[in-house]
């Protein structure tokens, strides 16, 4: 039973690490492309900024979903029920 709990915690940690890494890379690419496109066409900057904030919210949602799944695995572990 301790092996299942340990493996679940390690899996949840890896899930959170990759979600944070993916979100950070996504924000970096998003910010870079926004600055590049705003410098290329300054008249579209306000329109692009609105779209950038929408995509930034979706990027944050990916990390929050990963946190929710990790909390589910840690506190309401469905794999422990399979042992009994």
From Swiss-Prot:
Name the CDD domains for this protein. Answer: ATP-synt_Fo_c_ATPE (cd18185)
Lineage, broadest ranks: Bacteria, Pseudomonadati, Pseudomonadota, Gammaproteobacteria, Pasteurellales
- Oligomer status and interactors: F-type ATPases have 2 components, F(1) - the catalytic core - and F(0) - the membrane proton channel. F(1) has five subunits: alpha(3), beta(3), gamma(1), delta(1), epsilon(1). F(0) has three main subunits: a(1), b(2) and c(10-14). The alpha and beta chains form an alternating ring which encloses part of the gamma chain. F(1) is attached to F(0) by a central stalk formed by the gamma and epsilon chains, while a peripheral stalk is formed by the delta and b chains.
* Family listed: Belongs to the ATPase C chain family.
Gene Ontology biological process terms in this record: proton motive force-driven ATP synthesis
Instruction: Quote the protein name from its UniProt record.
Output: ATP synthase subunit c
Q: Does the keyword NAD apply?
A: no
User: What task does this protein carry out?
Assistant: F(1)F(0) ATP synthase produces ATP from ADP in the presence of a proton or sodium gradient. F-type ATPases consist of two structural domains, F(1) containing the extramembraneous catalytic core and F(0) containing the membrane proton channel, linked together by a central stalk and a peripheral stalk. During catalysis, ATP synthesis in the catalytic domain of F(1) is coupled via a rotary mechanism of the central stalk subunits to proton translocation. Key component of the F(0) channel; it plays a direct role in translocation across the membrane. A homomeric c-ring of between 10-14 subunits forms the central stalk rotor element with the F(1) delta and epsilon subunits.
GO CC annotation: plasma membrane; proton-transporting ATP synthase complex; proton-transporting two-sector ATPase complex, proton-transporting domain
Q: How does it sit in the membrane?
A: Multi-pass membrane protein
Recorded hits in Pfam families, A to Z, give: ATP-synt_C (PF00137)
Extra info from the record?
A: Dicyclohexylcarbodiimide (DCDD) binding to the active aspartate residue inhibits ATPase in vitro.
Q: Which UniProt keywords apply?
A: ATP synthesis, Cell inner membrane, Cell membrane, CF(0), Hydrogen ion transport, Ion transport, Lipid-binding, Membrane, Transmembrane, Transmembrane helix, Transport
Which Gene Ontology molecular function entries are recorded, alphabetically? lipid binding; proton-transporting ATP synthase activity, rotational mechanism
Q: What is its main location?
A: membrane
**Which InterPro entries does the entry mention?**
ATP_synth_csu_bac/chlpt, ATP_synth_F0_csu, ATP_synth_F0_csu_DDCD_BS, ATP_synth_F0_csu_sf, ATPase_proteolipid_c-like_dom, F/V-ATP_Csub_sf
Tell where it localizes. Answer: Cell inner membrane
Give site residues, Reversibly protonated during proton transport: 60
Question: Which ranges does the record mark as transmembrane?
Answer: 9-29, 54-74
